[in-house]
Amino acid sequence: MKFSFGLLCVMCCFYASAQEKSARPKIGLTFSGGGAKGLAHIGILKAIDSAGLKVDYITGTSMGAIVGALYASGYSGNEIEKMVKLMDWDALLSNNIPLQSLSMEEKEQYKRYAVELPIINKKIRLLQTGYIQGQELNSEISKLFFHVYNIHNFNDLPIPFKCMATDLETGKLVVLDTGNIASALRSSMAIPSVFSAVSRDNKKLVDGGLVRNFPVKNVKQMGADIVIGSNVTNGLSKIDKIKNPVDVLMQMAFFKESEDFKEELPLTDIYIHMPLEKYNTASFGSIDHILAEGNKTGRSYYPQFKRLADSINSLGVSPAKIDKPFYNKSVFVTEVEVTGLHLTSIPFFLHLMNFDDHRYYTAIQISKSVRRAQGSRYYSGITYTLEPLTKDSARIIFNVEENPASFLKAGIYYTKFRGINANINLTSRDFFINNSRDMVSFSLGESMQMEAEHLQYLGRIKNVAFIAGAKMDNQDISSYVDYRIDGAYRQKFYRGYLNFQNSGGNRIAGGIGASIENIRYHPTIHSMTEVQGNFSAIKTYLYLNYNSLNQALYPVRGLKLITELGYVYNQKHNLQLFQNGVQVADPNYDNFTRLSFDGSVFIPIHSGITLFSEIQAGVNFTDKSNVLNNFQIGGINGNFRNQVRFAGLPEASVNSPAVAALQLGLRIPVISNAYIIARVNALLKDFATFNTTTSPGTWLTGYALTFAYKTPIGPLELSAMYSDQGKRLQSYVLFGIPF
């Protein structure tokens, strides 16, 4: 209960008279769990620091455990607050892998499907023990506590510490005070059905808040004479707040903890209850407000902390000095162990990480190595423990959880151009050959697409790959004259390719390749200009790609480049070209060089506003134009053969052998997951004919205004667009992610 300051002074005087001079009353600090609300505890730490009050023992649960452990390991309240404000909580509390961590071979496939279901023992697995595995959270916690890697007994921390977890099998309390501190903290905050359970000491552990959310008994057992307890929860919900089955289950889950709280509360000497009723455990979007409430409460208790500190200090005994964290600390790793591998080998894992023994590593370097391995998508979770061998060296133990070898993925996609389609993908690793990825994808619906690919990793660190694949696209396309629909035809496009690629890190990849294409045309609505039949060609090319985007969907920062320089030859045809129903001479089929470029850049401006720009260019270096090889202009999204996107015109409205386009855009958040996107673009076509020294070309300009919303199964975009040349206001609807 909240004792008066006078009583605390009496207690201090008692210790002054009854103990030797070397004794002083021990101060215990207990922090409750509470998810995002638990960050308000930081305000109490700041007030304690300002008052000069020295804490001797700390206990905590869930988020209270994390805040308490940071303080126990040597961070100040101010330092903890600064770190919390810089954290990307959306990334930490999700299963998303940072796009920058993915290998270049995996980036284009990441987040293309709404659902990814593992296939284990030939069965599709739907659910795990928790939705979020928390790999990024694990990495962040490990980094923050790297400076105390050599401490495996939490009593040896600068301030002795314990945290609470629950045994998932028995429902009993588990007090964690030894071992890997990152694992202990992750266990303490593993909210059932939200975070996956943590394997530790032959147990499956979940959030300690189920049985003891306010562990005052434990800090008393550690030796605390005076206990400061900070609680951010409000206990069981009133009956009028229980409105659905989920509320019922949550209420029942905390019955046991509610009874325990009644025993914990009387053991506090200074009880602090935070006024955070308007927030909940998931209010990480309101961190600044929660921190402000914590600071306000801390300031209100500062006078009490100050008087208590002065009373204790008057006893003439100073507590031991706490060393500050050594932020740039490195450790010399002489031994490496890996546990948990069944589908892949230890050499393969270490090569992916580019990790060697007998080298110095910082926390950031180890985190980068872990992300590099996880970026291959062979692994779903990687944690590590450092065990000191000598004063200057350590053994590192990687605890690895592998992804299942195979996944079934699915999504839906709609545009007026493609119609509505179901996208289905089966991806399997090491199916035929070790160190490989095989993939088969289908888009089934109003249009038909297919892709099959085999990727074979080569080289010690798997930065070289051989890629073989085939694509098919069956699509109805409108033909245009003067920006008006004139007819339609069905295009069947087949492509086989072989690439030899080298990736320099996770941002850049280049290589050489060859492809063979076959295109078949069949008019479905007759038009002024018609093509019927098929032709094929071979292309040999060099390519260079770069991708530093921070996320796949609606990126905020980064650069993406796709460049290709190729030579088209061995064109074979069986075509008939008609003009107003009269057959005309065949198109030109001479060999030619082809250059294409697509670059996008995203720059954060302010308050979530993102400026973006895209440059596209394509040139066929030939003086005899062949419309079948031209670039097809139009469409805001999507991808089909030779497309150059242009806001203002539908897909394939215009074609040209030489195109250069610039788009500028602004994306403005309006509510959570919703944006207004404005685009303006200009395009120059037909600027190079190569049978004259110059060509003025033709300019196109267009605009689009889009409302975009991120749904759980993909983006929904509703656009109005206009072109100065087409002179028509048109709608453009997209739902889902293109195939």
Name each region found by the language model.
Residues 471-475, 515-519, 564-572, 618-622, ...:
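Short glycine-rich beta-strand segments
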Residues 480-486, 524-530, 577-585, 643-647, ...:
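Flexible, solvent-exposed loop segments that connect beta-strands
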Residues 364, 369, 375, 381-553, ...:
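Gram-negative/organellar outer-membrane beta-barrel architecture
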Residues 242, 478-480, 520-526, 573-577, ...:
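Outer-membrane beta-barrel and related beta-rich outer-membrane complex signature
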